[in-house]
A protein has these predicted regions:
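Short hydrophobic alpha-helical segments enriched in small aliphatic residues
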Residues: 20-21, 31, 41, 48, ...
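Non-catalytic beta/alpha edge segments that cap or flank active sites
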Residues: 8, 22, 27, 52-235
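Glycine-biased, low-complexity coil/linker segments
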Residues: 1-3
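Basic polycationic patches enriched in arginine
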Residues: 5, 29, 33, 38-39, ...
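Cationic, amphipathic, low-complexity segments that mediate targeting or membrane/lipid association
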Residues: 15-29, 37
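Short linear segments in intrinsically disordered or otherwise low-structure-confidence regions
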Residues: 7-11, 16, 36, 47
Length: 235
């Protein structure tokens, strides 16, 4: 009761101030404007006439589009049971890479041998013509799943967000079974290395939800291209 009456008196006092003739009209419009709407501003001149002007558009939304720069990408499939002819996951990644406008620099298949994997990835990292390495397979918890142990020691910096983003995207498809993936990524010698599970579905999730945009130099507000080029103009 008492609070209601007091609140009503305050509202009445506020209304008196807002509707007072001497209260600047533009302040009144400020208090009651609809957020997000762009409207003409009306100002009253000293002679009593009103002038109207349109506020400028937000120039931040009109940035010039970034150019597309293709990357040289190598693909490694890790499997004890597949051959290149049966490698549907590696083939999916190759097709996706080409469709996105990038260049396939190399593609091979190795068994789950930690040292063979490490040697191949290290060679690609040392190759200044290769900017991205995509690895499919060997990221689980079985005894022969050695990809994380093979490549993590090669990283100068880890890309923690890749594994997080991949597992988050996978929840809609496989639920909490996504915890069984040790997907990881890192950068070494300006080469980005992304490790994902061996299934074709997992490769598609990683590419469509994470890699496709982050390897595209046009993606705003940021992408991996500047970290992978040795050109001073784009770094």
């Amino acid at each position: 009761g008492g609070e209601g009456r007091g609140g009503g008196s305050k509202q009445a006092a506020l209304a008196t101030v807002l509707y007072d003739a001497d209260f600047p009209k533009k302040w009144f419009r400020h208090f009651f404007r609809v957020p997000g709407k762009r409207r003409n501003a009306v100002e009253t001149r000293g002679d009593g006439y009103k002038t109207t002007h349109t506020p400028p558009e937000n120039t931040m939304s009109h940035k010039a589009p970034k150019p597309f720069y293709p990357l040289n990408i190598a693909i490694l499939t890790v499997s004890d049971t597949r051959t290149l002819a049966e490698d549907t996951s590696g083939q999916y990644l190759e097709d996706a890479v080409r469709a996105a406008g990038h260049n396939l620099a190399a593609r091979t298949l190795l068994t789950d041998d930690k040292y063979h994997i490490r040697a191949q990835v290290a060679a690609w990292i040392a190759d200044t013509n290769i900017q991205v390495v995509l690895i499919t397979g060997g990221t689980g918890f079985y005894g022969r799943d050695n990809t994380p142990e093979a490549v993590a020691v090669l990283f100068d910096k880890t890309i923690d967000g890749f594994g997080e983003a991949f597992r988050a995207a996978s929840i809609a498809e496989i639920g909490m079974s996504t915890l069984q993936s040790r997907a990881l990524a890192g950068i070494a010698n300006r080469t980005a290395v992304f490790c994902m599970p061996g299934s074709t579905g997992a490769c598609k999730t990683a590419w469509e939800h994470v890699l496709k945009d982050q390897l595209d130099s046009r993606t705003r507000p940021c992408n991996f291209y500047p970290h992978l080029t040795r050109s001073e103009e784009t770094s």
